Structure formats: structure tokens, C-alpha cells
Amino acid sequence: MSTPSIPQFTSPFSPFSSGSHSTGMAPSQTVGLDTLAEGSQYVLEQLQLSRDAAGSGAGDGAPSTSLRNSMSHTKDQPPFDNEKNQSTGSGFRDALQRDPLVEARSAIRKTSSSAPVRRRISRACDQCNQLRTKCDGQHPCAHCIEFGLTCEYARERKKRGKASKKDLAAAAAAATQGSNGHSGQANASLMGERTSEDSRPGQDVNGTYDSAFESHHLSSQPSHMQHASTAGISGLHESQTAPSHSQPSLGTTIDAMHLNHFNTMNDSGRPAMSISDLRSLPPSVLPPQGLSSGYNASAFALVNPQEPGSPANQFRLGSSAENPTAPFLGLSPPGQSPGWLPLPSPSPANFPSFSLHPFSSTLRYPVLQPVLPHIASIIPQSLACDLLDVYFTSSSSSHLSPLSPYVVGYIFRKQSFLHPTKPRICSPGLLASMLWVAAQTSEAAFLTSPPSARGRVCQKLLELTIGLLRPLVHGPATGEASPNYAANMVINGVALGGFGVSMDQLGAQSSATGAVDDVATYVHLATVVSASEYKAASMRWWTAAWSLARELKLGRELPPNVSHARQDGERDGDGEADKRHPPTLITSLGHGSGSSGINVTEEEREERRRLWWLLYATDRHLALCYNRPLTLLDKECGGLLQPMNDDLWQVGDFAAAAYRQVGPPVECTGHSMYGYFLPLMTILGGIVDLHHAENHPRFGLAFRNSPEWERQVLDVTRQLDTYGRSLKEFEARYTSNLTLGATDNEPVVEGAHLDHTSPSGRSSSTVGSRVSESIVHTRMVVAYGTHIMHVLHILLAGKWDPVNLLEDHDLWISSESFVSAMSHAVGAAEAAAEILEYDPDLSFMPFFFGIYLLQGSFLLLLAADKLQGDASPSVVRACETIVRAHEACVVTLNTEYQRTFRKVMRSALAQVRGRIPEDFGEQQQRRREVLALYRWSGDGSGLAL
């Protein structure tokens, strides 16, 4: 005799009945909140209500007595009558026998008022559900229409509560019967129950789960059903010790059932089983391709380190609590961030246990797939794509210039990230940091509709980024340990401070968790923190980025790919495919016996160069900002190729950039940060070294009076003169000789090359307007370069500390170097006026420009403080320009030191114009106290308060 199906034993008393027993009991006509009354936890409440209603209506208590008798009769009679099941095969009680709950509710309805019952909508749209906003259930709903959001009902219906044992037992039984041909019947039975359950209105929203009834329901099952459940559960445990050849059976069966449905599969109203409940399953139960058919990238397969055939060098969804993708399975992230990190560590509450749904097949940018499981509860998928667009948006259609003030330079190619079919393989931490950077300034409605939305989303993205990055832990991932890992663990614990850096990472290869992506993630974190009021805390992120870049030897060129090189030095293979889709995420360090056989694409090589030069420039910039010595030295990158032109880089024209110089540059070569700002930072590095040598406690005085000092100053001056000449040549090449078409001596960077790299609205402008915009962009670059060049002359000849400058104990104000520095201060102010003409809001390079505007203003403050009404008109105009520039800076990238110096400069300018207050001495003393917060002498930390 065949085994009866599971719905055959469902009691009409059960709140989870599938609805197949309609012949035995009249179907309930209630919907909405009334459906909750069918749960067993409402029996006593409804009984009490029926008593009250009967007492007030009839007064004789007859209904209550009838109901009590009916309940006692039901209590004495078992809910499952095996004899009746065997005789009739229906599994239900007599159709004429009424449910006591129905009688109770009928009594209530007879005595209740005729007021309309408030109905709830069956489900809210995806946007309202994400925002926890009231929804009217329409398509589109009123909320989405008001805020211009995309109204969808695409999310999967879910049930609350713990997964039932029957689901697990049925899955195990289906797997064990697969070889006998019964697995299809079991799956059909389970899926049929889900279909009948979902057909009932209101259960997906209002369904409840009663553990007491569950235990009673299981205990009252027939004996042969209990044996089947026990066998099914034991089968799950036995599969852990089964031979490896038998393991794929259950995984294949679960995959055949489509885990997207198995994830929410229930039995007659039981709550859905979330993905976190699969943690108890053995490794062999889970399918090899992951938990969602929509998430089909093989590089992100579900890997368990205990499996002997697990693929290597891929992102892991294993059982390690240290795993950055652990929230994908509902696991808790690392408990806390390192002790040196003051930022809050990720809380497990921010990483909920997801019930996965298949990702949309129309994902605009597939590169986001690794991070989608982590951001599902933070931002919508469409907003993530929009934020990626914001990250790569250029403010100019003629030349690339990042629109976001927190993107100081492009490290990656836009086309590699946004390619629709073959995107660059990225770590989830890098993607999360890019979304976090873009969310700082995005004007999306999701981030602006409540005023607090941006702060909440940015905080969650920050915690997610830190949780995925795992600061200072860049060892091999679980299951990737080298053969001599046991010995390496001892060495790591002693020599490397227990940070988990493996010795093979310092050799020929680096693991995926310690690659270029992690360095770029540190850069994103450090940049945003540096632009905030927590500048001192940003040095921890910058130091981590510099240290990891040094470990990866990003300052050295990788050896050529011998296996793919021809005699003429060109590479074989499909260059476009290599550019868009690098073969692996890991990058070779190029030093070791095994490095010659590793192939690195030209795009990966250029990413390494650009990342190093960006860190090189910020090291020198922050050395001036925070009065600290250099970290990255010139000798570490003496053989590294200079970065290629940004426009050529974005279109992937590597052949046009084949001939480049090596080592730190000192000439202006392009419109990007790498073209005009990097050479200035090379020169600034020499000035910083001279400044710290001059102020050395033991050797400073002797070095200051030696001929070597004069020789070093002349050398830096020659570099500044070289940069000034290259700046004039650059301006002539891109303004005087610029015609409607590209000239012979100009790189082809116009037209189609920028159509796909500049998503601004001006990309469809005419050729003439683009040429004029290119001229304006060039003159703006020249103005910024000229201003910073004048400031470097001031730093080389003058004093950095404003208090020492105002006190003037050594009478430097009467020296010849002061006159030279003062002329450069006026020249810097004139360049600032030109900058305000082309860039009124100073949005071209707000992250870098503030400190040079400040240092170029100290001499003007000195002149206004000392000369007062006797100051020359040029000095007065220069002071007015500096005040305007600081006001623009405060609007664009608001920082405390700019607000403070604007007030100081305004009071000094008022004195120059003859408005001397009564408390003149007190105001001068107050100015010195304010400036004393920012010191560049002794142990002063500059802008880092």
C-alpha cells in the first residue's frame, strides 16, 4: 500500500490546514485580521469574548455552556482518528460536526455592531517595505508616485518563524528515495502543499506559528509518520559521515527543487525556512553552485573548506566567522574592529539573516553581484547601480575630472566596472567602499527624502565596508593555506604581530584578500575621513594603505609575461578581452621564483601604477597638512613607469602610452591629478625633507649653515622652474593650437573616446562647445598649477608656522627671502582670482586645495597685521581674494580650519581698510590664540587637531 500523502493527516482543527478538506467543513468567509483567529493561541481569547457576548446578549449563558461542552467533547476526542482514516481514507471528521471556534466567532458576530471591519492590504510594494512606509497596495502606489520611485512587487512572499521539522524531514526523505524514482513525487507533494497554501488570502502577511500546537500536532501523528520523520532526520545526520561519492545526491536533489523556492517552502502555513537554517546542514547537502540560480557567477561559488574538491582563489561563503561574506548565510560578522580603530565595528544587527531571492536578471551592472547580498537591507539594487554611475561621473565632457570631491583620481577603468557581460572581478569590500563614497554626495531621492536618510545609509555602508575589509588581516583565506602553513603560523605570530600575513603573500603571490582591491578600499576610507573633522584618525587608514602597498611592492614594475611575449615585445591574445575581464583577482608581486609564470594583463599593471602614484602624492600632501615626515620614498619607485594619460586609460588605448618615463615626474603632462598635481607633489617631497632636516634637534643648525643646504634649495628651485615651463607649454598645446580637430602633436582624446566615459548631460554637445570647454578646462588646470607652484616657492623660502611668522623673533621679515616669498604670495593670490573665475565654487580639487590656499595666505595675514593701513593696494586685493576663496571652500568642502582662518582674515582685512576696533590688542591676541591651534613647528601636528 502506498504511503499516504502529508495533507491526508491535516486536522480541520489545525490553523495550517491546506484547504483541501472543503468537503468536510464549510470554508471560512473571513479575510484579513480574522484569519489570525484560526490560530490555536487565540482559543482562550475568543472563548472569553464569546462568553461576554453571550452574557450581554441572551443573559442565560446558553451559548457559553454549549461552547464549553463542545470544547470538552473535542478535548476528549483525539484530533486524528486512525480508525476513521483507515475506513474512509479521508482523514477528516464528520462534515456535520461544527468547529467550536466557528461557533465562538459566530456568537461574536451576532452580538457585535455592524461597523465595517478594517481591512489590511495583503502586501506592500518593495520600496515601501524597504523604507518601512505605509503603502496603499496599488501599482504604482501613492508613495512611489510622490517621490518618483520605481514601484515593484517583485520580492518573494515569506513566512515568519522557525523552519518546521517536517520540511527538513521531507527533503531528506526525497533525497534518499531519489534513486528509486520517488524523489519527483515527494517534491511534487511538497510544492503542491505550498501552492494550496499560497492560494489562501492573507496568510502570507498574517500567518502565525504556534510551537505548542506544533508539538501537539507531531505527537498526535500516526506511528508510521513518526517513523518516517525520524528516519528522515537521521538521514541528514548520517549524510555527514557518508562516503564522498554519495554526497552529491542530496545536493543535486535540492538543486532540482530550486532553492529559491526551497528557501521559502512551507507546509500548510508553517513559517518559511530562512537561509540561516541551512547552517545546520552538512557540507554535502548544499549544492555546489550556491543558494540561488540567479546568482550564477562561478567565481562566487559556495565553498566549504572541509570539502576536498573545493575550488581555490575564489570568494568564499564558508562557515568561518572571519569570512567577509558570512552575512550572506546569516552568519555573524567579526565581533569587533581592531583596538587601534576608533570607528564602530560592524554590529550583527546590521547584517540580518537574509532569505535569499534570485537577483534580477536585468541587473544593470553585474559587477555588483558580490556585494548585493550584503546591501540588500541597506539600499535598493537600482540605487546601487546609480551610485556606481556617480562614482565614475566626470564633471567635464572634454577631459576626465571626477565629480565627487572624494574621488581624487581614477584608479580603475569605468568600462571594466560597468561592462554588461564581462565586468572586472572585484572584492565586495571595494564595491561597498565605492558605494559609500558615492553616497556622500548623491542626490538620489532615497538618500534625501528624509533628511536623516543619507547619514543612516552612509553609516551602514561604512560598517559594511569595514566588516568586509577586516583591517590589518590579509592572510590566505580559509582552505588556501600553503603546505608549510604550520611553520608560517609561528613566524607570523612572532615577526608580523599576529596580523595573519602569510609568508607566501610576501613572496610571489598575494591572496585575494590582500590584493590591490584592499589598498583601494583603504584609500576610499582614508579620503573621506581626511575631508571630515577627524583628520587625525584618517592617518590610521592612510598608514594601513601605505603599508599594504609596500608589502605588495606596488612601486616596482612586474616582469613581462614571458609566455605571452613575442620578439617585438607585443602581447598575444585578445587585448580587449584582457582589458575587460582580467583572469584573476590576485596580482603578482613580481619577486620570487614563481613569478615568471604568472600572467598579468596590462590593465592590472596600470592599476598597480596608478594606485602607487596616488598614494605617493597623498603621502607628500599629508606630510604638509600634518607636519610629518615622508613615508614612501623616491627610491622605492625609481623604476616605476609614470601613469598614462587619463583619457587614454579610460578607453584602454595602452599602445598609445607605450613610451613613458620612469620615476617621479616633475613636469605637467595632463589634465588629471596624475598629470598636473603629481609633479608638484614630487617637488613638495624635497621641500618636506629640507624642512625636517632644518628643524632637526641635533643636526638642524649645522645643516642650515652649510653649503649643502644652499645646493639643495637651488635643486628644488630648478625643479619648480622646470614645472613652470612645462605648464606654459601645456597651456599653449591645449589652447593656442587647439582647433576643431585634434592636432598632430596632440593625443587623440576627443570625440568618441569620451562619449562613454562622461555620463554628463553635455556629452551630446557640439564639437565647437566641447573645444571651448576644453580650453576653459585647460586654463583652470594651469591656474591651479600656478597657485600651488607659488605656494611651494613660499614653503621653500619662508616659515610654515603662522605663530612664529607673526612673532618674527629672528627678524626674517627684513630679510631678502621674505621679499621673494611675498612676491610669490601676491602671485598665488592672483592665481586664486583666476581660479575663482573658471571654478567659482572651487570644486575641481577641493580635497587637495585647502592647505595650499591656507599656507599661501599666512604672509598676507602677516602683512595686514604689521602694516595695517599702510599696506599696498596689491596686498589689499590679495587679502580680499583669499577671503572669497575661503568662503567658497567652506561651501564646497566644509572644514573647521577654513572657517577659522576666514574669520581671522576678515578681521585683519577690516584693520587694513582702517576699521580699527577699540579692543585692538585683544583682537590681535585672539587671532594668535586661534592660529596656535595649527602649528608647524616642534611637535605641532598641522591641521590634525
From Swiss-Prot:
- From the UniProt annotation, which stretches of this protein bind DNA? 125-151
- An individual GO BP term: xylan catabolic process
What molecular function terms (GO) are annotated for this protein?
DNA binding; DNA-binding transcription factor activity, RNA polymerase II-specific; zinc ion binding
- Known Pfam families for this protein? Fungal_trans (PF04082), Zn_clus (PF00172)
Q: Quick one: a GO cellular component term?
A: nucleus
Q: What are the record keywords, sorted?
A: Activator, DNA-binding, Metal-binding, Nucleus, Transcription, Transcription regulation, Zinc
Q: Where is it localised?
A: Nucleus
Q: Which InterPro entries match?
A: Transcription_factor_dom_fun, XlnR/Xlr1, Zn2-C6_fun-type_DNA-bd_sf, Zn2Cys6_DnaBD
Top-rank taxon: Eukaryota
Q: Where is the composition biased (Low complexity)?
A: 1-23
Q: Where is this region: Disordered?
A: 1-33, 52-93, 172-210, 559-601
Q: Is DNA-binding one of the keywords?
A: yes
Task: List compositional bias (Basic and acidic residues) regions by residue number.
Answer: 73-84, 565-581
Q: Where is the composition biased (Polar residues)?
A: 63-72, 176-188
UniProt-listed PANTHER family: XYLANOLYTIC TRANSCRIPTIONAL ACTIVATOR XLNR-RELATED
The UniProt family comment states:
Belongs to the xlnR/xlr1 family.
Job description of the protein: Transcriptional activator of the xylanolytic system. Involved in the regulation of extracellular cellulolytic and xylanolytic genes and in the regulation of the intracellular activities of D-xylose catabolic genes in the pentose catabolic pathway (PCP) in response to the presence of D-xylose. Binds to the DNA sequence 5'-GGCTAAA-3'.
Know the name of this protein? Xylanolytic transcriptional activator xlnR
